[in-house]
Swiss-Prot record:
Signal peptide: none annotated. Essential for viral replication. It may mediate the virus progression through DNA replication. It is found in: Virion; Host cytoplasm. Belongs to the protein kinase superfamily. Ser/Thr protein kinase family. Keywords: ATP-binding, Host cytoplasm, Kinase, Nucleotide-binding, Serine/threonine-protein kinase, Transferase, Virion. It comes from the Viruses. ATP binds at residues 45-53, 66. This is Serine/threonine-protein kinase 1. It is an enzyme of class 2 (transferase). GO terms for cellular component: host cell cytoplasm; virion component. Residues 39-277 form the Protein kinase domain. It catalyses: L-seryl-[protein] + ATP = O-phospho-L-seryl-[protein] + ADP + H(+); L-threonyl-[protein] + ATP = O-phospho-L-threonyl-[protein] + ADP + H(+).
């Protein structure tokens, strides 16, 4: 066994190496035009929706491998991630390769991090912490918007948090598309549970009102400690989705995002100026870059 491979096995045994650890896992090699990598043969998120994501290693630096089937999804994710390479708050694409069956994305690894779905399930969030998370999320989404893209699948599973620094990163750009503010969209590429009511009722949506809706859904679910997430069907059934343990302005923000009538929903550009976030701009530092600086790696 080579020394890099031995180092990688130590990474896999480290309890801080994400929340799924496999001490006896096998390791395989994979080569690109630039580097030799070692990759775990068992998914990081076994049994979930991300059984195509694996932990890897290159010269002492942990990385993440994501396999995307060429039969199911075209290579748009690579194009989008390259375009967003220097965007604060967006997970970095380090390198890309492919084989006959898969697009293979090699992505930065954020140590001591977890997705927001598991974070809010296992930790009861106080309003101030949840508010800071939501505010960061909005800033990142607007950064993506400024680059001419819409993520298309904003949900707590696609947001990871550095547990120590409380800094957010957006991941999984498989549903991202070019921004088109004026034309209705008839195909839903994101997660059905986060679909907006206009698509449910009429079969179309506009990108920005959909984004506001999904932000509202994430905001609701951040307060769902040890409980299943709320989704559109729960709201349409008339269930009370407004958290009890937040301020009136917090409740109003969620209500404004989750208004059934898209024309009365909070505007995309008005998100950061909502009264709930008053004074937060001074408190939140600019979104810092986590992990290794991989700028200009992708050409």
């Amino acid at each position: 066994m080579s020394r890099p491979e031995q180092q990688f096995k130590k990474v896999l045994k480290n309890p801080q190496a994400q929340y799924a650890v496999y001490p006896t896992i096998k390791v395989e090699r994979i080569s690109t035009t630039e580097h030799m990598y070692f990759i775990a043969t068992k998914p990081m998120f076994e049994g979930g929706r991300r059984n195509n994501v694996f932990l890897g290693h290159q010269v002492g630096q942990p990385v993440v491998f994501k396999y995307v089937s060429k039969k199911e999804i075209p290579g748009n994710e690579v194009v989008v991630m390259k375009a967003l390479q220097d965007t604060p708050g967006v997970i970095k694409l380090i390198e890309y390769t492919e084989n006959a069956m898969y697009h293979i994305l090699i992505i930065e690894y954020i140590p001591n991090s977890i997705d927001l779905l598991h974070y809010h399930y296992f930790k009861k969030l106080e309003e101030n912490e949840a508010k800071k998370i939501i505010f960061q999320m909005i800033l990142i989404i607007q950064n993506i918007y400024e680059k001419g893209f819409i993520h298309g699948d904003i949900k707590d599973e696609n947001l990871i948090i550095d547990i120590d620094q409380k800094i957010i990163k957006v991941i999984d750009f498989g549903s991202a598309v070019r921004l088109n503010e004026t034309h209705p969209q008839y195909n839903m590429f994101g997660t059905w549970e986060y679909v907006c009511p206009e698509f449910y009722y009429y079969g179309y949506y506009y990108q920005l009102p959909l984004t506001v809706w999904t932000i509202g859904m994430v905001a609701v679910n951040l307060f769902r400690f040890r409980a299943e997430n709320f989704y559109l069907n729960d709201i349409l059934k008339g269930e009370n989705y407004i958290p009890d343990n937040i301020s009136e302005t917090g409740k109003q923000f969620i209500t404004d995002c989750l208004t059934i009538n898209e024309n009365k929903r909070l505007s995309f550009k008005g998100l950061v100026s909502h009264p709930w976030f008053k004074g937060l701009k001074k408190e939140i530092q600019p979104i810092s870059e986590l992990g290794v600086d991989y700028k200009n790696v992708i050409t």
